[in-house]
A protein has these predicted regions:
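N-terminal FAD cofactor-binding segment of flavoenzymes
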Residues: 59, 84-134
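Beta1/beta-strand and adjacent pyrophosphate-binding region of the FAD-binding site
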Residues: 35-52, 72
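Short beta-strand to alpha-helix junction loop
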Residues: 95-101, 146-173, 302-303, 337-340, ...
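Glycine-rich FAD pyrophosphate-binding loop
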Residues: 45-47, 61-95
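Conserved N-terminal helical subregion
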Residues: 119-236, 241-253
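Conserved FAD-binding catalytic core of PHBH/FMO-like flavoproteins
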Residues: 107, 212, 221-353, 361-364, ...
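C-terminal helical "tail/cap" subdomain of flavin- and related membrane-associated enzymes
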Residues: 351, 412-491
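N-terminal mitochondrial targeting presequence
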Residues: 1-40
C-alpha cells in the first residue's frame, strides 16, 4: 500500500531559493532580454488548470513537506463557472470520468472527495465486455470474485463523476489550503524562455513564463499539465511520438429505463469500427462513449433524437452487419431498428444495458482519438504530467487515472528531494519520478493500442483466437480475470 502524501516525513527546514546549477547553459537557448523586468519568482509554476493540474496544485498544498512551496497555476479558460458550478438535478454533463479506487484514495487524502456530492457519483462493481463479431464475453463482477458485499475487500471497480464536478471539488479543496497557490485563469502562455542573472538569483537555467497579460513568472520548477499539445513540452524540446487512430469518440448522456432490478454495471461491446460503451450514472441516467470512424460519428450527430436513441440501443443488440447498414440511413432508423430487433435473438439485461429512452439535449459531442507518448517526462527544471506526457485511447478509462498517478508520484519525489536537501528542479529530484512512471504508462499505452488493433479485425484467424482468449479470461484460468481486475484498480 502506497504511503500517504500527507504523512511523508519532514527531515529539514524549508530551503532557500537558489540551488546548485547542474547543467551547462546552451548558447542556442532563448533568454529573457536584459531590459526585461524581473519576473515574480515561484517554486512551482503549473501550466494547465484541468483535473490533473488542479490535483497537482491541491496535492502540493496538502502534503506536509511541500505545503510551504510558493505555487502558481495558469489556465487559459475561465475557472469561475467551474468554481460556481450548481447543476440541475435532472441533468448530467456528457464528459464523465471513471475514477478507480486508488485515485479516490488520493482525492480523499488531499481533501477533495468531501466536496464531491455523492448523489452525483455512481459506483459500479461489475462490467460486461463482449466481442461484437463472435459474441464471446467476459464478465467482471467483483462481488462474485471477492466474496460479495460482506467481504472486507473493496469491490468497487470505479466511480463515475462528471469532469466539471471533479474540477469543482478540487477548486474547493484548494480554497481551503493554508498557503493557497496563485490561481491565474483567463490567461494564455505567450512565451517560455530561460532567465538571466540578477542581483538576487542566477536564473539562466530557470524557465520564465510570459503571460498574455504581460506578467512574467520565474519557475524553480515548471510543470506541464497542459494537455496533448503541451507548450511546456514544446519549450523543453521533448518529442511526443504516436499516431492518430482515425477514430472519434462520440459522447452523450441519456435517460434509461428503470434499472433498479439490476446491478449497476458498465457495458462495452467491441465492434470492428471501435468499442461502444454505456457507463452508469445515478438514477435513471447513463453515459455513452462510442469510438468509431469520423464519418459514422458525423452520421450519429446528424440523426434526429429518436433515431439516435434507436441507433445506440441497436449497438448493443443487433449484429455488426445490421449496425453498419443503419449507419447508411439518414432517417427512419427507429422504425428500421424496431423491425430488425423483432427478428433478432439477443441477450437481456443485465447481460446488456437496459434500453435508452431519451438523449439529453445538448449532450452529443465528439473528439478525435490518438495515442502519444513523450520521449521523457522531465527536463531541466521541468516535468510533464497527464496528457502532456501521454495520451491514451479512452476504451480502458485510464487516461485521467494515469495522470493523477503521475501527480502522486511527482509530489512524492519532490517531497523526498526536499527531505534530502535537493533543489526541486534538479535531475536528482525529478529523475526518480520518470523512472517510476514511464514504463508502467508505456505498458498501459501499448496494451490498449494492441487491444484496439486486435478488435479491428472482422475476419481472419485472429477473430477465433481473440474469442478463445476472452473465454479463457472469463473462466478465470490461472487467475487471469482477478489479475486484470486488480490491475485495473491501480493507477
Amino acid at each position: 500500500m502506497r504511503q500517504s502524501l500527507l504523512h511523508l516525513p519532514i527531515k529539514r527546514s524549508p530551503w532557500a531559493f537558489q540551488g546548485s546549477r547542474l547543467a551547462r547553459i546552451s548558447a542556442a537557448r532563448s533568454y529573457a532580454s536584459e531590459s526585461s523586468p524581473n519576473p515574480e519568482v515561484y517554486d512551482v509554476v503549473v501550466v494547465g488548470g484541468g483535473p490533473v493540474g488542479l490535483t497537482l496544485a491541491a496535492a502540493l498544498g496538502a502534503a506536509r513537506t511541500t505545503n510551504n512551496l510558493k505555487v502558481a497555476l495558469i489556465e487559459g479558460m475561465n475557472l469561475g463557472p467551474t468554481r460556481d458550478w450548481n447543476p440541475k438535478p435532472e441533468y448530467f454533463a456528457n464528459r464523465i470520468v471513471s475514477l478507480i479506487p486508488s485515485t479516490v484514495r488520493l482525492l480523499k487524502e488531499i481533501g477533495t472527495w468531501k466536496h464531491i456530492r455523492q448523489d452525483r457519483v455512481q459506483s459500479y462493481d461489475g462490467m460486461q465486455v463482449w466481442d461484437g463479431m463472435t459474441g464471446s464475453r467476459v464478465e467482471f463482477d467483483w462481488n462474485k470474485l471477492w466474496g460479495g458485499k460482506d467481504s472486507q475487500t473493496d469491490t468497487t471497480i470505479a466511480h463515475m463523476v462528471e469532469n466539471i464536478h471533479l474540477s469543482h471539488g478540487l477548486l474547493k479543496s484548494i480554497d481551503e489550503l493554508a498557503l493557497k497557490p496563485t490561481m491565474i485563469d483567463k490567461t494564455k502562455v505567450e512565451k517560455i524562455e530561460y532567465g538571466k542573472m540578477t542581483n538576487e538569483l542566477d536564473m539562466r537555467d530557470w524557465p520564465i513564463v510570459t503571460l498574455s497579460t504581460g506578467q512574467k513568472l520565474a519557475a524553480r520548477l515548471l510543470i506541464g499539465a497542459d494537455g496533448g499539445n503541451s507548450p511546456v513540452r514544446t519549450f523543453a524540446g521533448i518529442e511526443s511520438r504516436g499516431w492518430d487512430y482515425d477514430r472519434h469518440s462520440m459522447v452523450a448522456t441519456f435517460r434509461i429505463e428503470d434499472d433498479s432490478l439490476f446491478p449497476k454495471f458498465a457495458y462495452q461491446r467491441f465492434l470492428p469500427s471501435g468499442p461502444v460503451a454505456i457507463l452508469p450514472l445515478p438514477g435513471n441516467f447513463a453515459n455513452l462513449a462510442w469510438s468509431t470512424t469520423p464519418e459514422k460519428v458525423a452520421h450519429l450527430k446528424s440523426l434526429a433524437p429518436e433515431d439516435f436513441v434507436a441507433m445506440v440501443n441497436a449497438a448493443f443488440r443487433l449484429s455488426y452487419t445490421d449496425i453498419d447498414y443503419l449507419h447508411n440511413l439518414k432517417s427512419g432508423v427507429a422504425e428500421e431498428t424496431k423491425w430488425r430487433e423483432s427478428v433478432t435473438k439477443y441477450p437481456e439485461p443485465p447481460q446488456i444495458p437496459v434500453r435508452i429512452t431519451e438523449v439529453l439535449e445538448g449532450t452529443r459531442a465528439s473528439f478525435p482519438l490518438k495515442m502519444k507518448h513523450a520521449d521523457k517526462y522531465v527536463g531541466e527544471r521541468l516535468a510533464l504530467v497527464g496528457d502532456a506526457a501521454h495520451t491514451i485511447h479512452p476504451m480502458a478509462g485510464q487516461g485521467l487515472n494515469s495522470g493523477i498517478g503521475d501527480v502522486y508520484s511527482l509530489v512524492k519525489h519532490l517531497a523526498d528531494g526536499i527531505n534530502h536537501g535537493q533543489d526541486i528542479g534538479s535531475s536528482f529530484t525529478l529523475e526518480p519520478y520518470q523512472a517510476e512512471r514511464y514504463l508502467p504508462n508505456n505498458a498501459l499505452l501499448g496494451f490498449v493500442d494492441k487491444l484496439h488493433t486486435l478488435y479491428g479485425f472482422e475476419t481472419g484467424p485472429l477473430v477465433p483466437l481473440r474469442s478463445l482468449g476472452v473465454e479463457i479470461i472469463n473462466k478465470d484460468w490461472f487467475g487471469l480475470k482477478r489479475f486484470l481486475m486488480s490491475q485495473a484498480a491501480k493507477s
